[in-house]
Amino acid sequence: MDRFEISTLRSYYGALLTQRQNDLLVMHYDEDLSFGEIANIVGISRQAVLDGINKGEKHLCEYEQKLRLVEKDKKMHAVVDSLEKVDNQTAKNCAQQLRLLMEE
C-alpha cells in the first residue's frame, strides 16, 4: 500500500487505532521518518516500530474491508461529478443513484 492510501485510510479510521499505532503511522508516512529515527524518538526497538506500523496498516485495511467508507465516498464523488456535467434528466438519475449510495 502506498503513502497516499495509508493517509486516506488514516483520515477515515485513524481514531479507531491505538494512539501508539496512529503516532507511528504519522511519523513514518507523514513525517517520512525511518524506523530507526522513530525508534529513537519513541524509545522502542526498530522491530517494535515495524510491528506497530504493520498492525496499524492491517487494522486500517480491515476497517475499510468491513465498513467501505473510502469506497463509498469515492462512488458518491463520482456521482456528484456526473451531476455537475449533465442535462436535467440525467441529473435526476444521478441524484437517485446518490441517494441509494447514501442509504447503503
What are the roles of these predicted feature ranges?
Residues 78-104:
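Helix-turn-helix/homeodomain-like alpha-helical modules used for DNA recognition
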Residues 52-55:
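Residues within the DNA-recognition helix of helix-turn-helix
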Residues 9-17:
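Short amphipathic alpha-helical boundary/capping segments
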